[in-house]
Amino acid sequence: MERLVPPYALICRHDEIELLRGRVETFVRLADLPRVEDEGGELLALVPYRQLRERGDACHDDGTPLRALIVQSRETIGVGDLPTGTAQIENGAFDVDDDTYALQVKAILDEEIANGEGSNFVLRRTFVGYCEDTTATAFAAFRNLLVQERNAYWTFLIHTGDAIMVGATPERHVSLEAGVCTMNPISGTLRRPPSSATREEVLAFLSDPKERDELAMVVDEELKMLAEVGDQGGVIDGPYLKEMANLAHTEYYIRAHTTMDAREILRATMFAPTATGSPIRNAFRVIKRHETSGRGYYGGVAALIGRDERGNQTMDAPLMLRVAYLDPADGSVRVPVGATLVRGSDPYGEVRETHAKAAGVLRAFGVRTGPSSGSTTSYGVATGPVWADDPLVRAALASRNERLSPTWATYHAPGELAVPELVGRSVLIIDNEDAFTSMLAVQLRSLGLVVTRMPYDAVESIDGYDLVVHGPGPGDPRSAQDPKMQAGRAFARELLEKRQPTLAICLGHQLMCAELGLELHRRPTPNQGAQIPVGLFGRTEALGYYNSYAVLAPRAAGEWELAHDGPELAALRGPHYTGLQFHPESVLTRDGLAILRRELVRLLSNTGA
């Protein structure tokens, strides 16, 4: 083929390589991206991590631009049409050495997760090397990725003129087709090539509680996002084993009906918890505290937006993960990778995870780290599962859903599960900076309630509602200096004084209990993303916890009915309030919707509201 003149993009999806050519433009906001009006018209948007600034979220501003390739021509080519050559990186090393990275991991475990700032966080480091001819090197690496990497979502090379990106991303961030929005949370890592792993090793990986909970946490986080995108929330499908050349992951698909514009969806879903953490907006703050530089496009998205033959908007937007960034100006090659840190993470285990994640890209540049696996298609694209079709592996995957909430396995329209005592009753949800409240809103609407959801700092009055939900959120509930905790205590005080029917969840529960005079403490081990069986008011329930702090059970019950989790409160009931330390809306709470229904009926019946 003729020598390509940038800008252009080569994208391999579905065993075909698409060559897109056009012009590149730079934009300030996602809403500034041009609308694709005609069937067959397309644009390829490159959304940097710093785009968070347009939503007011925390990040290092490194100036990486929001760009779009306005597609003017498209053709399909084969691997044989690509230039041949050798990809080689020289003087390559991670910018943060292994020991330093392990110390950074420990700092996040001790300073953030243990202090209630979140359940999981992704800490990045970057492999940096140099090459002589960036364009030739990029093409050689692209060709190698097509042959070597298996089961990638996109394998691509994008040349904007002053920057080159080549990678094999495993993960769809979000897609849109016929009004259905799909996300694809991937987490949990088998840190070796599937082709060299034994069945016992794969089954041990699938039964590892750390790996299992890691995936459940990102499923919860993406369910939050899709509850913002569609009123009926998301529906989960999976889990599946996703096998790459040098490692394997577990994954779900989550789908939601939506009427949102593609650009609005991109804005609402910045960015995937698999590249950031949870709760998402506090994860951005934690990343800014612990990473010393901007992320460029790492953790951002590439979004191919167009229209189908019926005029419906379409979008295919993978995460920018497992990508090498080549700078023609200085010959540098950068491969950023991150590990997901959760309670129980081993710092050096997370070091090994970053090596495994970088390996798939680095092998394409001649940095040999281990064998590949899989057969190849007619295009030379590696494919074919090694373990995904094994009966024991499939059974192990299916068994994971036995512990999860069936609520999120099907759509529930507003009022579909209506309870007479709840129909038409009004509820205010106070959002304490955790979008679990968006999942709560979906559940409450399905029960027939009329829902208003507000950030804590936008609530002017709690009057005029039949019920108030004091929601979850990150942070130390004992902090007298934190404005959010001050506001949350004030809400709890007013709700108790007015005898307003109240459901308080996690942080809201802790703040309400503090106003009731109960003692809070920091747990010796965080319960972030843990499922625990607890006796709850006469029933044994599997409950999903995301807490680093808890309320100690009082010696005397007083006016309360208590549910204990050892020395701590799992829940308490008062005459006009219920406090729940766990998350009934979480996929980890097996019968969360039934628990919500019982408590809401009790509250609204007892008070005559």
Question: Each PLM stretch: what is its role?
Answer:
Residues 4-15, 122-213, 305-335:
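An anion-binding catalytic pocket shared by soluble metabolic enzymes
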Residues 73-92, 130, 190, 197-288, ...:
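Contiguous alpha-helical scaffold segments within structured protein domains
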Residues 255-388:
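Conserved hydrophobic core element of enzyme catalytic domains
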Residues 384-419, 586-609:
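Acyltransferase
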Residues 419-427:
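A short, charged/proline- and glycine-enriched loop
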Residues 426-427, 434-504, 516, 604:
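Flexible gly/pro-rich beta->alpha loop and the following alpha-helix that scaffold active-site loops
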Residues 489-495, 501-505, 509-598:
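Pocket-forming structural segment of enzyme catalytic cores
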